[in-house]
Amino acid sequence: MVGKILIDTNVLLDYLLEREPFFEDAKKVISSCTEGNTKGCIAAHSISNMFFILRKDYTAKERREILSNLCTIFDVEGIDKAKLLSGLANEEFSDFEDCLQMECAKSYGAEYIVTRNVSDYSVSNIKAILPSEYLGL
């Protein structure tokens, strides 16, 4: 496996919501981090996004517990003023949130962004790969 990865929100949601056919690969990616094979990171803004998205499936108390657990498993890379300004200046990204994910991955020193939306990162400085590609490394 590789040294450091940033796990995109969609992969985390695949795991938390057991979305098929993506759940098994997402589970294996997360397991590689919990077992110490890889250092995994999530962007801090992914937590707030997931708190909102998960509201249909979990109570507020359950969401707090689930997301707190993720924060103990993974390193969390925050968004500061410099990352925001860098992201805002980057006109190549069509999706600002993806640009912020890339900024977090870059700051963390990630080798890869593990995502199901590889095409969203076509202009990223950090290579984006599918969970299945990551598992094959």
Question: In which residue ranges do the predicted regions lie?
Answer:
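Short, well-structured N-terminal submotif of metal-dependent ribonuclease cores
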Residues: 1-41, 55-62, 123, 136-137
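Acidic, PIN/NYN-like endoribonuclease modules and their adjacent C-terminal/linker elements
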Residues: 2-4, 106-137
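A general alpha-helix detector
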Residues: 11-12, 49-50, 86
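Short, flexible helix/strand-to-coil boundary loops that buttress conserved ligand/catalytic motifs
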Residues: 16, 88-91, 125
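Short, conserved alpha-helical segments within structured domains
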Residues: 42-46, 83
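Short acidic, glycine/proline-enriched helix-loop-strand junctions
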Residues: 61-84, 121-137
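Active-site neighborhoods of divalent-metal-dependent phosphate/nucleic-acid chemistry enzymes
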Residues: 75-118
